[in-house]
Amino acid sequence: MTENIHKHRILILDFGSQYTQLVARRVRELGVYCELWAWDVTEAQIREFNPSGIILSGGPESTTEENSPRAPQYVFEAGVPVFGVCYGMQTMAMQLGGHVEGSNEREFGYAQVEVVNDSALVRGIEDSLTADGKPLLDVWMSHGDKVTAIPADFVTVASTDNCPFAIMANEEKRFYGVQFHPEVTHTRQGMRMLERFVRDICQCEALWTPAKIIDDAVERIRQQVGDDKVILGLSGGVDSSVTAMLLHRAIGKNLTCVFVDNGLLRLNEAQQVMEMFGDHFGLNIVHVEGEQRFLDALAGESDPEAKRKIIGRVFVEVFDEEALKLDDVKWLAQGTIYPDVIESAASATGKAHVIKSHHNVGGLPKEMKMGLVEPLRELFKDEVRKIGLELGLPYDMLYRHPFPGPGLGVRVLGEVKKEYCDLLRRADAIFIEELHKADLYNKVSQAFTVFLPVRSVGVMGDGRKYDWVVSLRAVETIDFMTAHWAHLPYDFLGRVSNRIINEVNGISRVVYDISGKPPATIEWE
């Protein structure tokens, strides 16, 4: 038996903060398993999960309003440490007899909090000292309401001029509340505070490591599928690639991967996928040449959402046909990751995350009664990448910029044609190659080229000609929810433009997209 890597676990109750997933990722980075649940869980669910500690997240609502979210009262009766962050601190204060008021001054941004009383949460942790030797912490505030009276059995640990109770604590019950966000990098000692809570106060061991996660996943796959055969749609993306490697390690030749070349991939991508997984790692892969079928289905369609649906539908059709050719396949594997699971989980009160439709395989033929294998469903994307490295996948593949599920189908604006895809593939390859050469690729979060279905006049030699236009797009972002356009050097952009126009016959003009998100989205379609 492998070690129980879920033995020590933290429960995070989500009150709707944009940072809640970041809290969970930070706890995982500390080597401790955690799960993210909606705030309105039942006592029975908490008992069943049996957490070593509970974190109450921030949230956008006001505790002073009627019907605003509250932590289940059992949280404070379970006998485990509790850590309230921002809104989580406010609801803790109110539910335990303190008081919260709306504030005229919204505190948003950097603040310095002064530690005025000793606490296990921040003992020995400081950024600087006051003139009389009191510790100061540089933190990131984002709140309107504030606690104006703490519960009777709590003490004030730290304060600011505008926030008298920046940290509160009940050391006996191991309840802690902070008005700032320790999970964001702007709170410089935030990770140390989370480590203090999770590792010291909750006494969780660091059992959640890439090597142990792999051992656990392999054993669970073997227990689930036994000697049965499994099929996986391999796209060459991070999630399906790591899923393939885990399954290959667990069940070897009982895994069949179906790789569909839809004609909408990057330059030489199909060849690279086959060489890496087939030749190098020795996986059993069915390679389907589907370019013409996808292009035929897309002919005449220019609406972006319709194109996405067509690409998804045809992929499922092709995958189904290949699955039916295989004998005795009992399981379908998918690269579902933890954020997919969170976003699809609806809260009982309706204050839930938005459910999004994923570009995973759906709708297998009814005659194929298959079970589902999802070895990554507990993992965040950064954890999937770390596991991929541990399994031997190349860094450049795992840390490549995001590529949309429908591929070039949504990077060719309007109707998708083979001519447009071929031009775009070559132009995009030049842009990416030059980013690598200039050591800029890892400095931007995402970079790609878009094909515009407009002809523009150009001069070549002594003649004029009308050829196509492409746009370069590069953005910098932390979370892909908001993004700035990347300020790439002019000489670099000039070099890329010259190469594309000179080397890709059919393109006469290159433009650079300088739109931020919002109002623009990162992808054009």
Swiss-Prot record:
It catalyses: XMP + L-glutamine + ATP + H2O = GMP + L-glutamate + AMP + diphosphate + 2 H(+). The active site is at 86 (nucleophile), 181, 183. The keyword Ligase applies. PROSITE patterns: GATASE_TYPE_1, GMPS_ATP_PPASE. GO terms for molecular function: ATP binding; GMP synthase activity. Pfam families: GATase, GMP_synt_C, NAD_synthase. Residues 9-207 form the Glutamine amidotransferase type-1 domain. Catalyzes the synthesis of GMP from XMP. Homodimer. This is GMP synthase [glutamine-hydrolyzing]. It comes from Klebsiella pneumoniae subsp. pneumoniae (strain ATCC 700721 / MGH 78578). The gene is guaA.
